[in-house]
Every structure is written in structure tokens, then in C-alpha cells.
Amino acid sequence: MNMIIRFSLSIFLLSFTGPLFSQREMIDTAVFQKIRTAELNSSEIPQIAYHLTDVSGSRLTNSPGFKRAGTWAVESMKKWGLKNAAFEPWGEYGRGWDIEEFGISLRAPYTGYIIGYPLPWSSNTNGEIHASVYEMADGQLTDSVWMEKHRQDISGKIILLTSAATKHEEDFKANSHRLTDSELVKIPDTYVYNHNQIAFILPMRQRLIDGKMKLKSFGALAVLDCRGTYSGGTVFVQNSTGFRANSPVLPPEATISTEDYFRIRRLLASGEPVEVALNIKGKFYSDDTKAYNVIAEIPGTDPVLKDQIVMLGGHLDSWNAATGATDNAAGASVMLEVVRLLDSLQLKPKRTIRIALWSGEEQGVYGSYNYVKNHFGNGETGVLKPEQSKVSVYFNLDDGCGKIRGIFCDGNTAVKPIFEQWLTPFRDLGAQTVTLKSSGSTDHVSFEWAGIPGFQFIQDPLDYESITHHTNMDTYDYLKLDDMKQSAIIVAAFVYQASIRPDLLPRKTLIHEIFPFEGL
């Protein structure tokens, strides 16, 4: 009901016969109204999201689920009328993985349930194992002297790694949140990292790998851990190793809920013997170790501008404990809806509109980074390819399913007043913030690195960080479909405006820096 009321108000704002800001940006209000009407009356977002989540399943890069989702997207875009819809290889990645059997339970001091999930690319237990649990800290895993001293304690055990996980304390804050006007005014840089920060963690990661290899050599049967501070059975599941063709074979590993983690620790601390049964049977897919993005286009119609490109996208890959609904089937669904909407309205963009659904984002934005290197050049060396100069902009969506409240300009002062004008017709939808602050850690960073304007939208967080992000709860039921429809309206308008304006969007100076996630 609220969306309908907001739409009615918007008609008043967009009812002018001429373009707004005629002395600056030429905004086609009639097209904006068509986009709104079509999306609110005939959105296909619910069906698109359903196919990417419930039907496709989890979407680890190179897994059957990713291929199901990508194939459906390619075939759907062909049916909608887009051109050149296809999987495009971007380079060497590694193995796919999918779970075939999994079970975990407490067997002593009594039989009971444990909420847990296998880490993606975990090795197999080769049937159910049943063993005592031995507790050790993350720091001890990297202490070779301590490890050697406790070799006999480790042998034949399931190891519980203790970490920074903290017990849930009720804080009486709502799990879901919309940004207030005061928060939008003060919005900070978000998820921004440089290469030095990323490089700092790489030796630490290698030490953990080495420690787990030593556990295996000492006879440890498996590893259990707990990642994060979630409660209510919500389990955070991700893994940074195991997918490369030459990855070492580590002990089987699963992640368990904070409640079960602390229960086991309390039992061990009191001297109770704790035994766990664990079965992990996964399947590795290594016939094709290249990875693929999904690409399609709406061809430009202007004889002069049709070779220039406006890009939009989001990553299609996810983690394995759920179906990756808010991260990032939501963003992928919105972007698919945008191109479906624009093509169905036969708007005839002057520039070519190209959508990209990326793979390998969760491991280090590999899909977009390699796509940019393959097509546009190297931002570190400054050796750029001819196509780089033809890309006006890339728009990204990857912060959950909340409605768009604005856009990060990533320090691009020249583009800020342009976006402010483009957003003005959508103030009634709650989108009005245009900030020079930056958002990082997702695929637009690849374009920025190569000197191409790349932007992430500001979205209401809802329960993205509190419940769904990289967890077993990231399912279709947490999607806010009306919010996603609002996002599709705004992204479609931005993409269309970029495709028809006389000039390419303004660029920042190329910095010539190492890609932030190089080496991951």
C-alpha cells in the first residue's frame, strides 16, 4: 500500500511536460513515469529471485547451483530479447564443490542435536566418524612448539577451535533497520580496504593453513569452529581456501552455532567427556577449472554512441549454507529486472547497455577484476585497452535487499551534482542521498581501479548484517520484494539516463595502484 501511495505522489512530481533541470541534466520524465508504472504493475522480481534461490540452490562459483542460476539467467535474457547473452570465461579459478551428505550430532555425554554446516570445499570424512572433542585456541594452531607438545592429545580427536566468537547478550535492538535521515547525512566509508590491509592478513591465513595441515599430520580427524556472534541458530559460513586446483587437503571442517559451541566448551571445562558424530560428503568439480560471468546486452541505437557502453551488475555467486538470497540474488535479480524492464519498454538507448552477473566475488571479486583486465586494461600499470575509454559507467548492487536510499560517489566530485539531479524525482521513494564517501569490497571496485566510474548504491541495511549475510538464514523468505522493486525503478532510471546523455560520465584521475584484493 505504501508503494502505491508513493507512486501517486510521484505522478505530481513527474507531471511536467518538459524535462527537469533543463539548464543542466536533461531528464526524460515521461520515461521515468513509464519505468515506475511498468515496474509497479508487472514486476517479475519475485519470479526472478525464486529461480535464482529456491530453484538454483546455493551458488558457489563453479558449482552446479551457480551453473543452474547462470543458465536460467542466460536463457531468460534471450527470451526477453537481449542480445549476446552467454557465459563468458574470465580465466583460471579452480574447483567447484557441492555437498551430497552432511550430519553432525552430539553423542556424549548424551545424544543431542548440533546446528552446523560444512565449510565449502571441505575434505570428506569418508563416512561418519565418531570421536572425542579436544579444544584448542586459534593461537595454539599457529604455535608449533605447543602443537608438538600436544601431539598425542590431538591424535584421533575432533578439534574444536576456540576463537573470537562471543556469547549472545540481549541488547534489545531490532534486528532490522532502515537508515534515518540523520544517519544518511553522516554515512561513512563502508567496507573500504586497501591492498596493504589485505596483504597484512595473507601471512596469517597461511599460518592457519599450515596449522591445520599439522593437525592432519598429527592424526586429527576433523575440525569444528564457530565464526561470528550470531544467535538463534544463525550460523556464519564461509571459507577462503580449498577451491584452487593445487589447494592442500586440510582436515574435514564444519562450523557450528554459537549456542552449541559454548555448550561444548562448558562441558569440556567441567571435565565432561564430549563426543561428536560427523559426516561430510562433498563432491568436487574439476573438469573445467575456468570460471565464467554471465553477460548480455541491449544494443545502442545511436550511430555515433552505440559503441559506448553503460554497464550494470552484481555478483551471482553465494556461499553454501543457504541460497544466497540477500547476498546476492537480490542484487542480481534487481539488475536482471532492470534490463528486462528497459528492453520491454523499447526505450532504444543511445549507448549499449551491458549487464554482468559476476562469479568469484566472494573469494576476492575475481570475476569482475579479471573481466576488467581482459576488456579494459590494468589500473596498476596504466596500460589500458581501447574499450576502456568507451565505458561511461558501471552501477553495482550488492548490499542486501533493502531499498535504495542514495548512491556513493567514491570521491568523484564532478558526478555528484549529476546524480543529485537524477535522484530528485525519487525523493518520494526515500532515495535522496548522494555522498562523496566510498563503498568497497564488491565489484564496482574493479572498474574504479581501471579508471572507469563505478558506483555502489546506498541501501537500507534491514537484517543483512544482523541475520542473513553469509549465514544459513540467507533464504528467499528474508527478501523484501517491494524494496527490490523500488531499487529496480531507480537503477533503471540511472542506467537509462547514462545511456542517453550527450557525454560520458566524468571520471577521476587513474591512481595507478595495486588492486586492493590482489593475492587473495
PLM features: residue spans?
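Noncatalytic luminal/extracellular "stalk/propeptide" segments of secretory-pathway proteins
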Residues: 24, 50, 54-190
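Short helix-loop-beta-strand segments that form the rim/entrance of peptidase-like active sites
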Residues: 47, 188, 341-366, 389, ...
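Second-shell loop/turn segments in exported
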Residues: 32-40, 54-64, 120, 124, ...
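N-terminal capping segment at the start of a domain
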Residues: 27-63, 236-243, 317, 393-399, ...
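Soluble metallo-hydrolase cores and metallopeptidase-like ectodomains found primarily
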Residues: 30-31, 122-146, 151, 241-325, ...
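His/Asp/Glu-rich mid-to-C-terminal helical/loop segments that flank catalytic regions of hydrolases
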Residues: 245-248, 252-256, 263, 340, ...
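Metal-dependent peptidase/peptidase-like ectodomains
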Residues: 111, 131, 156, 166-168, ...
